[in-house]
Swiss-Prot record:
Any one GO CC term of the record: cytosolic large ribosomal subunit
GO BP terms, alphabetized: translation
Protein name, per record: Large ribosomal subunit protein uL30
Origin species: Legionella pneumophila subsp. pneumophila (strain Philadelphia 1 / ATCC 33152 / DSM 7513)
Signal peptide start and end residues: none
Gene from which this protein is expressed: rpmD
Length: 61
């Protein structure tokens, strides 16, 4: 199995660029402090890097 990353939305998307709000929704993050676990793939990392100022990313086994 591949690595997993836990992504938590720590800042609100209110007032952010529409593209950044859409990326948060694509990742499955709706409200502040919501978390999701995704596989650590280049595609997911690319989305995370776009909105890294809104997120907390933790690696898990």
């Amino acid at each position: 199995m591949g690595k997993k990353i836990k992504i938590t939305l720590v800042k609100s998307t209110i007032g952010r660029k529409p593209k950044h709000v859409a990326i948060a929704k694509q990742l499955g993050l709706g409200k502040t402090n919501s978390s999701v676990v995704h596989s650590d793939t280049p595609a997911i990392r690319g989305l995370v890097n776009e909105i890294n100022y809104l997120l907390l990313v933790e690696e898990s086994a």
